[in-house]
Amino acid sequence: MTTSELIRKLCKEQNITIAELARRIGQTRQNLYKKLQRETLSIEEMKQIADALGVVFEQSFTLPDGNKYTIRNEGMTNEDNR
């Protein structure tokens, strides 16, 4: 599933249109549609979308030793996977 497919799925589950999501994050509907179509959302936009949808956005860095750092829209955590 692509990022844009997931965003559309979350919107559908919450009965939120892409136009409404765009309004919530301060973008035009046309601009958000283009970014979803091209898969060109920035990390900051992903955080804004997560906040607007009431979900957590996170990314992870896993070090060679198994130590994992997860960045969420509310901060960073360290998960020791050893």
Place the predicted regions along the sequence by residue.
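DNA major-groove recognition helix of helix-turn-helix/homeodomain DNA-binding modules
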Residues: 44-58
